Amino acid sequence: FILLGLLISNLESFSSTERTNINKFIFKEGDNTSQNNIVLIELRGPILNKPSGAIEFSLIDNIEVIYVSEFVKDLEEIKLQNPKGIVISIDSPGGSVSATYNLYNAIEKFKINNKTKIFLHTDELLASGGYWAALSSDKIYASYGAMIGSIGVRGPDWIYYDNPISISTGILGQTIETKDGIKKYNTIAGRSKDLFNSFRMPTKKEVESLQ
């Protein structure tokens, strides 16, 4: 077997035409005369659908990002190599719902249409949408100490002032005095997605998991 690595350039810095000339496969290890190729892809950062021009001029333009639109182009290049298998090395905290959904489908579609085994490995972080996308692979491997899981959706919090009796403003901001206290409602989908919420007691299972 021969292990090939796909070099992925800084996507914000190049147009799609320039990017095609820069991306290439490099020999990693194995028998370089073999036709049995295994491709290694490295993905790092949050998951977004495509690059935004606004990001290029922001303070975060050097942060690594997984762009699904560019990943799909990479898969087209990989298909030409006719690999026996693909290893995706990923570290991601998650991303937008639509981008994560598209990444999952891109991997799943490639795997089925090309009858290619896809294995996924993480060294440090595979959380939220990152783990969701990883479920499209045939098997997930994790290094010791890697943070895995935590899939869920959280919306904005709803603060309710129960029976307010005084509202005032000042140099320190607005203050509200209530007769029956303040209640906070969390919009979440999934168990314990409001972990460390100061407005509720932790469950016994949550404490045991953290310990």
Spans of features found by a protein language model:
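Small-residue-centered hinge/linker elements
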Residues: 1-116, 128-132, 136-211
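Glycine-rich beta-to-alpha transition loops that act as phosphate-gripper elements at the mouths
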Residues: 119-127
